[in-house]
From Swiss-Prot:
Name of the molecule in the record: Translational regulator CsrA
Organism expressing this protein natively: Helicobacter pylori (strain G27)
Pfam short name (any one): CsrA
Key word Nucleus present: no
GN (gene name): csrA
UniProt-listed SUPFAM superfamilies: CsrA-like
GO MF annotation terms: mRNA 5'-UTR binding
Entry GO CC: cytosol
Lineage start: Bacteria, Pseudomonadati, Campylobacterota, Epsilonproteobacteria, Campylobacterales
GO biological process: bacterial-type flagellum organization; mRNA catabolic process; negative regulation of translational initiation; regulation of bacterial-type flagellum assembly; regulation of carbohydrate metabolic process
Annotated transmembrane regions: none
Family, as annotated: Belongs to the CsrA/RsmA family.
């Protein structure tokens, strides 16, 4: 992991098209500003983890009876 120190109004550039700027630092909280192409997905880490967790739950909770019905419809 690369660790960089930045002050307010200083920034970081990633791949020439993603710009991250420190907007403010206040009582243990850092506000960051991001400039990136619209196609670039930017998420807070906890939101990304929640999405992954929900996707895993959704894929794991398949009703076995539904699978059996699908097997009956799709015969080899």
């Amino acid at each position: 992991m690369l660790i960089l120190s930045r002050k307010v109004n200083e920034g970081i550039v990633i791949d020439d098209n993603i710009h991250i700027k420190v907007i403010s630092i206040d009582r243990g909280s850092v506000r960051l500003g991001f400039e990136a192409p619209e196609s670039t997905l930017i998420l807070r880490a906890e939101l990304k983890e929640a999405i992954v967790s929900e996707n895993q739950k959704a894929s794991a909770s398949v009703d076995e009876s539904v699978l059996e019905n699908i097997k009956k419809v799709i015969k080899p």
